[in-house]
Amino acid sequence: MLAFNFFGATEGGLFDINATLPLMAIQVVALTYILNSLFFKPVGKVVEKREKFVSDNIIEAKNKLSEVEKLEADLLTQLQSARTEAQRIVSEAENESDKLYKEALELANNEANASKEKARLEIESQTSAARDQLSKQADDLSELIVNRLILEK
């Protein structure tokens, strides 16, 4: 008995080696098997499915995000080219408007100058005709005066 006291507990102490230990080991193994087959495997499958679902959704979201970023870049490029095109069209329209304005102004000036020249020529013609008529009348009048003076003598 002394040897047992030296190595550990005595009967009814902390640890008794009897049929309880193998029975407890069998219970632990059976409980582990039952829990593994009834709880851990189904829960593990559900967790794996959920992880796969989440990872697939993350991959899909990353793909969609990259597609959206690409589309955004394309739209920004298209918007910039549309703005450039609109500015070019506005500039061309302004240039065309200025050109038409200058042409209309030049045409109006030419017409005004032509009307002015026509009026000047008409005035000169009428002045010349009036001078000729006055000259003729003066000649007629002087001839008439000369004839009367001659007749009176």
From Swiss-Prot:
**UniProt keyword NAD, yes or no:** no
Q: What is its main location?
A: membrane
CDD domains per UniProt: ATP-synt_Fo_b
Question: A Pfam family for this UniProt protein?
Answer: ATP-synt_B
The terms under GO molecular function for this entry are:
proton-transporting ATP synthase activity, rotational mechanism; proton-transporting ATPase activity, rotational mechanism
What is its subcellular localisation?
A: Cellular thylakoid membrane
What GO cellular component term, any one, is given?
Answer: plasma membrane-derived thylakoid membrane
Record field: transmembrane? 23-40
Membrane topology recorded in Swiss-Prot or TrEMBL: Single-pass membrane protein
Q: Which domain of life is it from?
A: Bacteria
Q: Which UniProt keywords apply?
A: ATP synthesis, CF(0), Hydrogen ion transport, Ion transport, Membrane, Thylakoid, Transmembrane, Transmembrane helix, Transport
| Chain's role | F(1)F(0) ATP synthase produces ATP from ADP in the presence of a proton or sodium gradient. F-type ATPases consist of two structural domains, F(1) containing the extramembraneous catalytic core and F(0) containing the membrane proton channel, linked together by a central stalk and a peripheral stalk. During catalysis, ATP synthesis in the catalytic domain of F(1) is coupled via a rotary mechanism of the central stalk subunits to proton translocation. Component of the F(0) channel, it forms part of the peripheral stalk, linking F(1) to F(0). The b'-subunit is a diverged and duplicated form of b found in plants and photosynthetic bacteria.
* Record note on quaternary structure: F-type ATPases have 2 components, F(1) - the catalytic core - and F(0) - the membrane proton channel. F(1) has five subunits: alpha(3), beta(3), gamma(1), delta(1), epsilon(1). F(0) has four main subunits: a(1), b(1), b'(1) and c(10-14). The alpha and beta chains form an alternating ring which encloses part of the gamma chain. F(1) is attached to F(0) by a central stalk formed by the gamma and epsilon chains, while a peripheral stalk is formed by the delta, b and b' chains.
Q: Which family does it belong to?
A: Belongs to the ATPase B chain family.
Q: What is this protein called?
A: ATP synthase subunit b'
* Gene for this chain: atpF2
